[in-house]
A protein has these predicted regions:
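Short, well-formed alpha-helical segments that are part of the catalytic scaffolds
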Residues: 1-23
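Acidic helix N-cap motif at the loop->helix transition within catalytic regions
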Residues: 8-11, 33-42, 83-84
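A conserved acidic beta->alpha catalytic loop
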Residues: 16, 28-37, 51, 75
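Catalytic-site signature of metal-activated, phosphate-bearing donor transferases
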Residues: 57-63, 80-204
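Residue at a conserved register position within TPR or TPR-like alpha-solenoid repeats
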Residues: 196, 233, 267, 310, ...
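Alpha-helical repeat scaffolds
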Residues: 207-211, 241-249, 277-282, 316-325, ...
Length: 618
C-alpha cells in the first residue's frame, strides 16, 4: 500500500485483509495525521518514500519490500469483500489476476471495472506510468500468463465528497499531462481523456479520446473508450455524432451492458423514445456485465430510466411500476426514492396508500435508512415528512419540523414555529410565502418579503393573492420570477388539496402570456386534472393555432385519453408545423393505435429514410 494522510480509511482497509494475507507492507509518502499510528497496530513493515509525483516509482518501491510468492495491491480507500478468497484465486499459479473493483458513487450508485491487483512476486513485473500506474503484463519478452480472480475489491474514492476532499481531479490532470507529453501512447491518451471527462471538460476529453482510438486496436479498454467518447459528445448535445459512435460500437460489442445503457441514454436525450425503451429493456435482459460496467446498468438504473421515459410520456402507472423495481433492487439509490414519491403523488394515491406501498418495498432497518428518507421527503416538501419524524421520534431542526407541519396541513402549528424563529432560513422563504397565501396572513408575508427581493410590481401580485382580490387588474404583467414561483405553488396547492386557493392563483397566471398558461395546463395534466386542462387549452389553441408547444400538448392529452379523432387532426397539424422526428413518432404511435397500418408504415419509411440513427424503423 502507498499512503498519505489516510486516517479516515486505513483501518477499514487493513482490517479487511487480516487473516487473508501473510504480511502487510505500507509505504508512507509524508503523512501528518494519525495514519502511521493506525498502521502500526497492524504491521511493523512501514517504509518512508519521498514523493516525486510518480505513482509507479512508489509502487515499484513497495513491491521490492514484499517477501511472499504473490502480491496484492490495495489503496487506503479500498477494502476486500468479506467473502474474498485469495488462496482460491492463486491456485492456478498464473502470473497475474484481474480482480473486479467495485467503485462506490454518490447517492448509492456504483460502477465496476477490472484491474490487475494480484500477481506473482517477480522482478520482471513492474509498474509503469506516473498516475494510472499499471503492470507491464503485455511484454513479449516474458510472455506472462494471466486470468480472472473472484476476489472483489470495494473502492470509495469516487464519491463526490471524497473527490472534493482530495482534490483528485486537479492532481490527476497535472500528472497525466506530464505523462502524455513524455509517452503519448493509447493507454495514456485514453486516461487523459477520462481525467478531463471527470473534470467536466468534455471538449478536451473528446480530443484525447479521439487520439487514443486509432492507437488502441484490440486493447481491453476499447469498449470503455467508445462509451466515454459517446457520453462526452452527448454532454455537448452532439447527439448525431454520439449515436454514430455508439450504434457502431454496439455491433462490435453486442453483449456489453454499459454500452447499451449509454446508447439508451443517448436515444432518450435525442427524443428517440421507442429506441430508448427497447434499449433499456435489452439492458435488463443482459444484467450487469462487461469489463467496465456501472452497477445497475442492467438493473435498477435501466428501470429508473424507463420510469423517467414513461413519466415523460405521461404513462404514470408504467412509470410507477418501473420505479418500484428500482427500490426493490437498490433501496440506497436516492434518486429512486425521490422519484417514487413524485410519481406516487401523480397517481392521486392517498398519503396512507403511498406510505403503505413504500414500506412494503423499502425496509427501514438502519438509522441511515430513515435519514435518507427524511432528506428526500424534506426536499420534496412531502406530506409524509411529519409522519416519519413522529413515527421514529427524530429530533430535527426547527425549520424542518415547521415544514413538516405545513405540508401535512397543520398550518397554524407551522405558522407558530415560523414566527418563533428570529431569521427564516433562505431555503424556507418560499415555504413561508406559500403559508402566508394559504392563511391570508400579510404579517407572515412581511417576514420574508424583503429577503425575497421582490420589486414593487411583484410584491403587489402576492399581496393580491393573499387578499384574494377578485377584481385584480387584468393587465398585470408577470415577471419570470413570479411566474416560476406561482407554477411551483400550483403543484403544492394541488397536493395539499387547497383547490380554492389554486383557483385564485390560476386566475393570476391566466392573466399572463401564453407560456405560464401552458405550464399551468401541464401541472393540471401531471396531476390527472385532464378535463380542466383541456378546457383551458382549447381557447388557447383557438387563439394561437400555430403554437407548436400548444399543439403538441393538446395532441398528447387527446392521445393519452383516447380522444383519437382529435389526436389525428392535432398530430397532423403538428407534423405540418414541426416535421421533426418527435412529430413523426407521435403520428406513428397514433396510426398504430387506430389500426391505420398503411399510414403507420408510410411514417416508418419516412423515419428510416431521414433518421439513420433510429433503429426501430430500420
Amino acid at each position: 500500500m502507498i499512503v498519505k494522510n489516510e486516517e479516515g480509511d486505513i483501518r477499514r482497509c487493513l482490517e479487511s485483509v487480516l487473516r487473508k494475507v501473510d504480511e502487510i507492507i505500507v509505504i508512507d509518502t509524508g503523512s501528518t495525521d494519525n495514519t502511521l499510528k493506525i498502521v502500526s497496530e497492524f504491521t511493523s513493515n512501514i517504509y518512508n518514500f519521498k514523493w516525486i509525483g510518480d505513482f509507479s516509482a512508489a509502487r515499484n518501491y513497495s513491491i521490492q519490500k514484499a517477501t511472499g510468492d504473490y502480491i496484492l495491491v490495495l489503496d487506503a480507500d479500498e477494502f476486500l469483500d468479506v467473502d474474498s478468497d485469495l488462496q482460491a484465486d492463486i491456485e492456478s499459479e498464473l502470473d497475474y489476476y484481474l480482480l473486479n473493483i467495485k467503485n462506490a458513487l454518490s447517492y448509492g450508485g456504483a460502477f465496476t471495472h477490472g484491474a490487475v491487483r494480484l500477481f506473482t512476486n517477480s522482478r520482471n513485473l513492474k509498474y509503469e506510468n506516473r498516475l494510472h500506474e499499471h503492470l507491464n503484463i503485455i511484454n513479449e519478452q516474458y510472455n506472462f500468463t494471466g486470468g480472472e480472480g473472484k476476489t472483489i475489491i470495494h473502492h470509495t474514492g469516487y464519491t463526490n465528497e471524497t473527490m472534493n476532499q482530495k482534490d483528485k481531479i486537479k492532481r490527476n490532470l497535472s500528472l497525466m499531462l506530464k505523462e502524455v507529453e513524455e509517452n503519448p501512447n493509447a493507454y495514456n491518451t485514453f486516461n487523459m481523456g477520462k481525467t478531463y471527462m471527470l473534470a467536466g471538460e468534455y471538449e478536451k476529453a473528446i480530443i484525447y479520446l479521439k487520439k487514443a482510438y486509432p492507437l488502441s486496436g484490440n486493447q481491453v479498454f476499447m469498449p470503455e473508450l467508445l462509451c466515454k467518447l459517446a457520453y462526452c459528445l452527448g454532454q455537448l448535445q452532439k447527439y448525431g455524432d454520439a449515436l454514430n459512435i455508439i450504434n457502431d460500437a454496439v455491433i462490435i460489442y453486442p453483449n456489453d451492458t454499459e454500452m447499451r445503457y449509454i446508447q439508451g441514454v443517448l436515444f432518450m436525450d435525442t427524443g428517440y423514445n421507442k429506441d430508448a425503451e427497447e434499449t433499456f429493456k435489452k439492458c435488463l435482459e443482459f444484467g450487469d456485465r462487461g469489463m467496465t460496467v456501472t452497477e445497475g446498468s442492467g438493473g435498477y438504473l435501466a428501470y429508473y430510466r424507463l420510469a423517467e421515459l414513461y413519466e415523460k410520456q405521461n404513462n404514470i402507472q408504467k412509470s410507477f411500476d418501473a420505479i418500484v423495481e428500482v427500490i426493490k433492487r437498490k433501496k440506497e439509490y436516492v434518486p429512486g426514492i425521490k422519484k417514487y414519491f413524485e410519481i406516487a403523488t401523480k397517481l392521486n394515491a392517498s398519503v396512507i396508500e403511498v406510505q403503505n406501498k413504500f414500506e412494503h418495498i423499502y425496509d427501514i432497518s438502519r438509522i441511515n435508512d430513515i435519514q435518507v428518507l427524511l432528506d428526500v421527503l424534506y426536499g420534496l416538501r412531502h406530506p409524509l415528512l411529519e409522519t416519519y419524524i413522529s413515527k421514529y421520534k427524530i429530533n430535527v431542526q426547527s425549520n424542518v419540523i415547521a415544514s413538516a407541519k405545513q405540508y401535512s396541513r397543520q398550518y397554524y402549528e407551522a405558522r407558530m414555529l415560523w414566527n418563533s424563529m428570529d431569521i427564516i432560513p433562505e431555503e424556507n422563504r418560499l415555504d413561508v410565502l406559500l403559508l402566508a397565501i394559504i392563511l391570508r396572513d400579510n404579517v407572515l408575508y412581511a417576514r420574508v418579503r424583503t429577503e425575497l427581493n421582490f420589486n414593487q410590481r411583484e410584491q403587489k401580485v402576492f399581496s393580491q393573492l393573499i387578499d384574494r382580490e377578485e377584481k385584480a387588474p387584468t393587465d398585470t404583467v408577470l415577471t419570470t420570477l413570479v411566474e416560476n414561483i406561482l407554477i411551483g405553488f400550483s403543484s403544492s396547492l394541488i397536493i395539499l388539496q387547497e383547490y380554492d386557493i389554486f383557483q385564485s392563483l390560476s386566475d393570476i397566471l391566466l392573466r399572463g402570456n401564453d407560456k405560464p398558461k401552458i405550464k399551468l395546463c401541464e401541472v393540471l395534466i401531471n396531476y390527472n386534472f385532464v378535463e380542466v386542462a383541456i378546457d383551458l387549452l382549447i381557447p388557447l389553441y383557438n387563439s394561437k393555432p400555430n403554437n407548436i408547444k400548444l399543439v403538441e400538448l393538446l395532441g398528447d392529452v387527446c392521445f393519452n385519453n383516447n380522444y383519437l379523432d382529435e389526436s389525428v387532426l392535432l398530430y397532423n397539424k403538428l407534423l405540418d408545423l414541426s416535421p421533426d422526428y418527435n412529430s413523426l413518432e407521435r403520428c406513428y404511435n397514433l396510426y398504430k393505435r387506430i389500426g391505420d397500418l398503411h399510414s403507420a408504415q408510410q411514417i416508418k419509411d419516412k423515419i428510416h429514410n431521414i433518421y439513420k440513427n433510429v433503429k426501430w424503423a430500420s
